């Protein structure tokens, strides 16, 4: 479904009337708008509206869902390697020459590519950062499978801070972390508030565990083999005994490792299209747990711990 210039202009006018916040932490270079209870860039909201209006899911579709900077790139790489392993191995995979975001498109960003894949009977999972309550109705109506990856909120905040600073070309001295923390703490962040995003999918997973798999980033890092097997089985591509014996799982883990992907030429020097041109290297910063300790003051730690306890204490979900 093509979107006309008039439709885009109409959406742009509507978005301008929404509640908005100009990010002080990024020196006013980014403005977020609030639509259906989440904050997003103008193109995020345009993409969400178009997906809601025109995306038609199929019963066997699989969606990789996440809040930004929570392990999305890694999850995409793993899922893509799993579903294409009959065609490609660690020496021929398109992941060697494409950033994972080009292999698995976002429904709110690459709708045209997704429709082309559907028309060509090309199956790959799709991805989204959209909150659960904003998803196109067909995804929920057809009980499409979803995999949600989440991460320690403190590391998410630090990763988000650096990503925003880098894409807006702000040096460290001009982008105080304290301001970024404060905005995030008050729920003002892309696709946020973070806890609403997380809890939307979590509560849905409790109601429909057969269609929503929750993966904790730190757990996948600690035990990649078991979690890659869980992922493959859940999305309908389980490993055979022969594959396990031949080391296919280990090959996929190695192919998709941070060490491997971050050192590929495409991910060191390539660029991705978006609201702002984004260097692929920015998707591969550190991938380390606990980097937040280098940024958080004791007061910040206490504030965020108290906030998360208030938001999650009765849910059974653990972030630490």
From Swiss-Prot:
Q: How is its activity regulated?
A: No requirement for divalent cations and insensitive to p-chloromercuribenzoate, iodoacetate, or iodoacetamide.
Q: Name one GO cellular component term.
A: cytoplasm
Report which superkingdom the organism of origin falls in: Eukaryota
The keyword Protein transport belongs to this UniProt entry's keyword annotation: no
Q: Where, by residue number, is the active site?
A: 129 (proton acceptor)
Q: Which Pfam families match?
A: Sulfotransfer_1 (PF00685)
Binding-site list for 3'-phosphoadenylyl sulfate: 69-74, 151, 159, 217, 285-287
Q: What is its main location?
A: cytoplasm
According to UniProt, the reaction catalysed is: quercetin 3-sulfate + 3'-phosphoadenylyl sulfate = quercetin 3,4'-bissulfate + adenosine 3',5'-bisphosphate + H(+)
Keyword annotations from UniProtKB, A to Z? Cytoplasm, Transferase
Tissue localization of expression is: Highest in shoot tips and lowest in mature leaves and roots.
Subcellular compartments: Cytoplasm
For this UniProt entry, the molecular function terms from Gene Ontology, in alphabetical order, are: quercetin-3-sulfate 4'-sulfotransferase activity
EC number(s) per entry: 2.8.2.27
pH-linked activity: Optimum pH is 7.5.
Q: Give, as one word, the top-level EC class.
A: transferase
Q: Which family does it belong to?
A: Belongs to the sulfotransferase 1 family.
Per the entry, what this protein does is: Sulfotransferase that utilizes 3'-phospho-5'-adenylyl sulfate (PAPS) as sulfonate donor to catalyze the sulfate conjugation of quercetin 3-sulfate > kaempferol 3-sulfate > isorhamnetin 3-sulfate > patuletin 3-sulfate, but not tamarixetin 3-sulfate. O-sulfation of position 4' of flavonol. May play a role in auxin transport.
Protein's UniProt name: Flavonol 4'-sulfotransferase
């Amino acid at each position: 479904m093509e979107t006309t210039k008039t439709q885009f202009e109409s959406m742009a006018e509507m978005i301008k009337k929404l509640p908005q916040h100009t990010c002080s932490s990024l020196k006013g270079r980014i403005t977020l708008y609030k639509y259906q209870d989440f904050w997003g860039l103008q193109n995020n909201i345009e993409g969400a509206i178009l997906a809601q209006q025109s995306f038609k899911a199929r019963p066997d579709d699989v969606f990789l869902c996440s809040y930004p900077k929570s392990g999305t790139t890694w999850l995409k790489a793993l899922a893509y390697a799993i579903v294409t392993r009959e065609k490609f191995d660690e020496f021929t995979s398109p992941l060697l020459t494409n950033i994972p975001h080009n292999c698995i498109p976002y429904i709110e960003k690459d709708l045209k590519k997704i429709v082309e894949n559907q028309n060509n009977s090309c199956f790959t999972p799709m991805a989204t950062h959209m909150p659960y309550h904003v998803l196109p109705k067909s995804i929920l109506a057809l009980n499409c499978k979803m995999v949600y990856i989440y991460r320690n909120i403190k590391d998410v905040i630090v990763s988000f801070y650096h990503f925003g600073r880098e894409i807006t070309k702000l040096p460290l001295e001009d982008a105080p972390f304290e301001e970024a923390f404060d905005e995030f703490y008050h729920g003002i962040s892309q696709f946020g508030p973070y806890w609403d995003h997380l809890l939307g999918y979590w509560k849905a997973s409790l109601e429909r565990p057969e269609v929503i798999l929750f993966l904790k980033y730190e757990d996948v890092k600690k035990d990649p083999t078991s979690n890659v097997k869980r992922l493959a089985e859940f999305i309908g591509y389980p490993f055979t005994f022969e594959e396990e014996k031949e080391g296919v799982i280990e090959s996929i883990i190695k192919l998709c490792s941070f060490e491997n992907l971050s050192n590929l030429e495409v991910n060191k020097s390539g660029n991705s299209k978006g609201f702002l041109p984004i260097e692929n290297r920015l998707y591969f910063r550190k991938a380390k747990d606990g980097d937040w300790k280098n940024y958080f003051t004791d007061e910040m730690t206490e504030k965020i711990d108290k906030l998360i306890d208030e938001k999650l204490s009765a849910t059974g979900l653990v972030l630490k």
